[in-house]
Design a protein with these regions (language model features):
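Short sequence/structural segments immediately N-terminal
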Residues: 1-225
Length: 225
C-alpha cells in the first residue's frame, strides 16, 4: 500500500473484500507482474475469483444458463474487487446494478410488473440458472408463485384462452408494458385491417371470445400447416 495510496480510501467502505482487509494483495495479484497491468494470478478473471469462491465455480460450470458477464469470464461488471458500500461488493444497489447493462427504458413503461419494483432477483438468479433467462423456476411455475391459477378471477379472465398449452409470456410481457394486464404490443393482421369477423362471431355467441373455431384450428384458416 506504500505505492498504491489511492486504495487506502477503500478500507473506509462498509464492505471490504477479505483478502484486501487482511492486506493480502498477493492472493489475487503477482508481485512482479504477469498478465497485463493488473498482474493477476489468472488470465481469466472469473477463474481467479473461483480460487476462493470454489463452490460458485462448481455450480456455474453445471448451469445450463449463465449470466452473460460471468459467461464471458468477468465478475467486475457487477462487483468491486476491493471494497464497496453495498452488500456482496456490488457496484450499485438492487436493479440499478442490472440497468448498467440492461436498457432501463424497456422496464419503465407505464404498466409495470410488481416484482420489478421489488428487484430483478425476485424472478432471476444473479449468476446462473438451469432455466432460460436465468429464471429461478420454470416460467409457468415462477408465475404461479404469485398468481393463483385456480382463483376465480384468474379463470374468468382467461376463459376460452388455451393457456394450458403455452407460456404466460406468449401474451404478457414480464417487465412492463403500455397496455393493461402487461399485454404485449401486437396487432393481428385482420384486426389491423378492421376485419374482426374473420375470427369472431357476433357478441351473442356463448363462447367468451366468440371465435369461429377453437384452439389452433382458427389459426390454420390463414396460417397453413
Amino acid at each position: 500500500m506504500d505505492c498504491h495510496k489511492e486504495k487506502l480510501n477503500e478500507f473506509q467502505k462498509k464492505y471490504v473484500h477479505s483478502p484486501m482487509s487482511k492486506r493480502e494483495c498477493e492472493a489475487c495479484h503477482l508481485r512482479h507482474g504477469k498478465i497485463a497491468v493488473l498482474s493477476l494470478r489468472e488470465r481469466e478473471e472469473r477463474r481467479l475469483c473461483y480460487t476462493c469462491h470454489s463452490q460458485m465455480g462448481l455450480n456455474m460450470d453445471k448451469m445450463a444458463n449463465v449470466h452473460t458477464a460471468l459467461k464471458q469470464g468477468m465478475c467486475v461488471p457487477c462487483h468491486n474487487p476491493h471494497a464497496s458500500e453495498n452488500k456482496s461488493l456490488l457496484k450499485k444497489t438492487g436493479s440499478e446494478q442490472c440497468f448498467t447493462c440492461h436498457k432501463q427504458a424497456t422496464f419503465m413503461r407505464a404498466k409495470r410488473h410488481k416484482p420489478l419494483a421489488d428487484g430483478c432477483l425476485t424472478c432471476h438468479s444473479a449468476h446462473g440458472s438451469p432455466y432460460k433467462d436465468n429464471l429461478r423456476k420454470q416460467e409457468v411455475e415462477l408465475c404461479q408463485s404469485c398468481h393463483n391459477f385456480t382463483a376465480n378471477n384468474f379463470r374468468k379472465a382467461h376463459k376460452d384462452y388455451p393457456v394450458q398449452k403455452g407460456k404466460c409470456t406468449g401474451c404478457h410481457t414480464p417487465h412492463s408494458s403500455t397496455n393493461d394486464k402487461l399485454l404485449r404490443e401486437s396487432v393481428h393482421a385482420p384486426l389491423n385491417l378492421g376485419q374482426c369477423a374473420s375470427c369472431h362471431k357476433p357478441v351473442t355467441d356463448p363462447n367468451a371470445l366468440g371465435v369461429i373455431a377453437l384452439d389452433g384450428k382458427l389459426c390454420y384458416t390463414c396460417h397453413k400447416k
